[in-house]
Amino acid sequence: MKVRASVKKLCRNCKIIRRDGVVRVICSAEPRHKQRQG
């Protein structure tokens, strides 16, 4: 899980979602693409 000021999709499988006011990226194909904004 990367914590970044700005989260971006890194591949076409990445999805940007918002959980409890926190913007996150989840990726089914590449778990290393997981990010959260903070």
Swiss-Prot record:
InterPro entries: Ribosomal_bL36 (IPR000473), Ribosomal_bL36_sp (IPR035977)
Keywords, ordered alphabetically: Ribonucleoprotein, Ribosomal protein
Any single biological process term in GO: translation
Cross-referenced Pfam families: Ribosomal_L36 (PF00444)
Keyword Ribonucleoprotein: yes
One GO CC term, this protein: ribonucleoprotein complex
Top-level taxonomic group: Bacteria
PROSITE patterns, per the entry: RIBOSOMAL_L36
Disulfide bridge map: none
SUPFAM superfamilies, alphabetized: Ribosomal protein L36
Molecular function terms, GO-annotated: structural constituent of ribosome
Record family assignment: Belongs to the bacterial ribosomal protein bL36 family.
The protein's name in its UniProt record: Large ribosomal subunit protein bL36
UniProt organism field: Stutzerimonas stutzeri (strain A1501)
